[in-house]
UniProtKB/Swiss-Prot annotation:
GO molecular function term, any single one: DNA binding
Protein name stated in the entry: DNA-directed RNA polymerase subunit beta
Gene (UniProt): rpoB
Pfam families from the UniProt entry: RNA_pol_Rpb2_1, RNA_pol_Rpb2_2, RNA_pol_Rpb2_3, RNA_pol_Rpb2_45, RNA_pol_Rpb2_6, RNA_pol_Rpb2_7
Origin organism lineage: Bacteria, Pseudomonadati, Pseudomonadota, Gammaproteobacteria, Pasteurellales
Catalytic reactions of this protein: RNA(n) + a ribonucleoside 5'-triphosphate = RNA(n+1) + diphosphate
Amino acid sequence: MVYSYTEKKRIRKSFGKRPQVLNVPYLLTIQLDSFDKFIQRDPDGQQGLEAAFRSIFPIVSNNGNTELQYVSYQLGEPVFDVRECQIRGTTYAASLRVKLRLVSYDKDAASGTIKDIKEQEVYMGEIPLMTSNGTFVINGTERVVVSQLHRSPGVFFDSDKGKTHSSGKVLYNARIIPYRGSWLDFEFDPKDNLYARIDRRRKLPATIILRALNYTTEEILDLFFDKVSFEIKDNKLLMTLVPERLRGETASFDIEANGKVYIERGRRITARHIKALEKDKITQVEVPTEYIVGKVSAKDYVDLTTGEIICPANMEISLELLEKLSQAGYKNIETLFTNDLDFGPYISETLRVDPSYDRLSALVEIYRMMRPGEPPTKEAAEGLFDNLFFSSERYDLSAVGRMKFNRSLGIEDTTGSGTLSKEDIVNVMRKLIDIRNGRGEVDDIDHLGNRRIRSVGEMAENQFRIGLVRVERAVKERLSLGDLESVTPQDLINAKPISAAVKEFFGSSQLSQFMDQNNPLSEVTHKRRISALGPGGLTRERAGFEVRDVHATHYGRVCPIETPEGPNIGLINSLSVYARTNDYGFLETPYRKVVNGQVTEEIEYLSAIEEGKYVIAQANSNLDGELRFTDAFVTCRGEHGESGLYRPEEIHYMDVSTQQVVSVAAALIPFLEHDDANRALMGANMQRQAVPTLRADKPLVGTGMEKPVALDSGVAVVAKRGGTIQYVDASRIVVKVNEDETIAGEAGIDIYNLIKYTRSNQNTCINQIPCVQLGEPIERGEILADGPSTDLGELALGQNMRVAFMPWNGYNFEDSMLVSERVVQEDRFTTIHIQELSCVARDTKLGSEEITADIPNVGEAALSKLDESGIVYIGAEVKGGDILVGKVTPKGETQLTPEEKLLRAIFGEKASDVKDSSLRVPNGTSGTVIDVQVFTRDGVEKDKRALEIEEMQLKQAKKDLVEELEILEAGLFARVRNLLLSGGFNDKQLENLDRTQWLEQTLVDEDKQNQLEQLAEQYEELRKDFEHKLEIKRSKIIQGDDLAPGVLKVVKVYLAVKRQIQPGDKMAGRHGNKGVISKINPVEDMPYDENGQPVDIVLNPLGVPSRMNIGQILETHLGLAAKGIGDQINAMIKQKQDVEKLRGYIQKAYDLGDGSQKVDLSTFTDEEVLRLAKNLRKGMPLATPVFDGAHEKEIKALLELGGLPTSGQITLFDGRTGEKFERPVTVGYMYMLKLNHLVDDKMHARSTGSYSLVTQQPLGGKAQFGGQRFGEMEVWALEAYGAAYTLQEMLTVKSDDVNGRTKMYKNIVGGTHQMDPGTPESFNVIMKEIRSLGINIDLDEE
């Protein structure tokens, strides 16, 4: 494999045996692609904004004289970039302008001649844009729109599994679900009548729907039944015989023909009998007259002389009727063919309970059910029914729905109209009846072929369409009002409803969520999340067990491991690594095609629907050099997802990768295959809660997924183009782009500004640190700067800790951990947390609030950290209760007398009419002020601090641009210099001239002169561009801010807190092995090995066997081996050994095992080998891919190479006594994470605080500065001990005895320690409650 310069700095050795066939795809595709489809112009108008516009426009007025047509749309450029929007608290959005055409026609002209056309661009609100990382910035905060897994539109056949009716009878039902519009359900009741429901309302006999579709009784029976015809001949009754229909029946009379008895009476009819009848070609058989009694007529029989109906369709035939029919001259009588087994009389029975008799009565019934209480008219009833399923405005199956509908009914063509047709409804009823008759299967709702993904773009389009529909109504009204001479499209359209609908979706939809920004992994996972909840989805209370369960079709599409614990389990899932959505929104996963037992290079994506037809081999099947299966039988997933053994020639496809099944977070767990699923789930979830540490440390034992996650998360800076590093400092990297990658006529310089110490959504710290050095060559797509939790472009969520599995004095009881003080000293788990506190000055009724340092009744000490504007200075160390921003609010309770007004006017006594409402540091918080921002409303005078900040920003912006210009100029003048030197000038001449004069020289060579003139033009362009950019920056910085109504000024203060690890903090490994730190032990007390090296963490060995997460033990062993090799390399470097020896040793380590990754160090220069060795000193990074990891023998070999015992166990000594422990202990390196559950955020103690209004008891919870609840059971405990006085104190003065507690407070302050409890307030409450019941209750004093 060829490594680039940066990749050679540190190579992760992989134990993966299978070569990588398909690279891990870009992980945020699902978000970015979906949104791109939404905003790009789709020429077919099938999706996105274009589709929404085309579905609503043209809007025609009610009289048809005018129409508003849609021409095209365009999105503007956002005013502020993403970073500026976050700082200012605005939405990152672009304005939408739509070109509309208002056409008016002549009233009298029948042909519709056009009278007038007005075309105009209309503003239609703002559309939030997606950032390059798949997020949205809404009101300054980053949000993610989670994709939804919802039931695909189409038709579904289901049964109640015998749960509805007490008899346990299985009732079948069918449901037609459109993308938008009314649902239509068909269902059987326990009496086997077929009913229909519209929108889950009251049920109606299903035949009402058929009658409303204009079918007569005769046509209905014709659609659903086969006929049996009887002939009356010579007073005999002959029945046309279809032998196949007789199977399984019992003959109720002798079946004979031509004098031969084929079947005797009372005998069961078998296949042998049928064969005999078919052989002799018997087509008619004589039946006794009684046989026809009870059969049902298939059509109306009319008396031809009188026109009177003798026997209507669907009537049971009796002997009298038969007599009448034969008298009327009917020789042939048709009846319905039914039997109890597989041709039930359901529709015929339903027609009997159907109250309607023709189309109109059916429509009236439907109208009454949909609009109870309204008087039906013929027009209204027809209009309602047509609009329900046959109007494209109200009903749309969508392309997906039509495809699923046709597939379900076995129709070849998967395209068609978005509305239903008569045939569609009849076909659904037919299939439902077939299923009831035992032919066909019900659908599996949880199959991923019946559930589809609805992503951001689609949801945004739906919201946008809702907004457009609201506008459409208003436009229609306006068009109908007449007087359209002076009206322009701009006057007709109000953008408010549109922007309100879009804003509502992005701001408050259940699926638009505050981004989880703990670390890069949590960001990536959040964007790849798939939720079954949300509008149009399930609710967690109603979701049963089946929906939440892992389904066979999840394989390679949805991760079976990663899902939250708790009420949402199984409803929120994560996309598998390689999964993607197809055009219809169904999840697909890639497979390698197999032809005749030979695996090809071809890769195909299959959806769950297609996958069911094939046999698919697993990724770990053994292949030979020619990619043929070596085993006679291969474990595969066959039809319907059942696994079994198949011959190689029966196999159609093979998995692409062993990681195909799991999601990104689960693919980061090494030795996942050795962990119990429940613990793996916790491990995957807890990695998302890891807080980025001060110094990121790559995992010694990884899985190879660390790099793609870090790159795709967007937290690191990636090179846009290759080149050389020209300048680097903590906040900026400049790259001189390679000649072949520059565009003609540009300077070829890329400047990357880094993000420094900013706050994430979870209050963790986002900071980028350069990881390249001056002069280094880089390639496109390489990492230039590490973000939070990344180390040399690899995800690094925690730290590698030396752990020992052994009990230690009970300090690791029940998952606690004993941590060495060295971990604290080295700041291994120190994290930075940044909090934003804001102070808002509003305009109140009594006057405006003011931000000032002049605060009434506050001592000098409290103001010591404020500047003259009343705002805290940067760098101040503050603690709970300190003032950050001084603010006073006018108070105006008192009406002043004229005398007082005069005095106040003379002496300017101001303190009395304002109250202090300053922003203070919340209790329990302390930290350093790292940044202050002041936002002032347009037209309000800026204070001194705001001007200072503005000045600083202008300086910084100018400095940035000047530096950029200098770098670009240097590049340009370098080219000018080369040109002049080649054109006859020498160095000395050029040095005597000013650089700008170089451009004025003339060269003899015409070609070179032209080049020089071009460069001079470029120089001018650069200067102009610089001025222009500076002006834009300046206007952005100087302009007032767009604040909420009534807000004059906002001051935001950022506090940074450095949190070291301490007892009570929660830590975890990657295998679901979580615990709380019980004690931080001095280094000298920790167990140490014979080299005197102490361990960092002592874990409890009893936490492993019962939890069955053995992966952590294997990780520990492999980590020890990795460290051992690092130690060996370190020793060789320290001894200054020969580079060749070093190269040999490292090569040996990379070659160990039979992995597919080959590292050839012979192509590395000595310098590169040394750099690599230096980076491997702390341990050699290893990768053990999921389900394809290191084997035990490889771990042992690696331990041996590192000069360590192959058992992975070491003799330890007690740090306090120096004695040996009685048996060897498993010691190694485990990757530990510090989770965002810090004791500082949870611990809390109340002094005197606020009380609840009604009960007067202290509030609860840290946020309310509440107390600890002394509940019912605690009271019982004190009662049991007979601690009467303690109990009395608890129930009165410490709780809700108002007078008692004030008295007590005074006593304590006064130094007298006595209490006299009074009546608790809650006693008064109960008295009031009893009085409210009308019972008078009084307390009599004795």
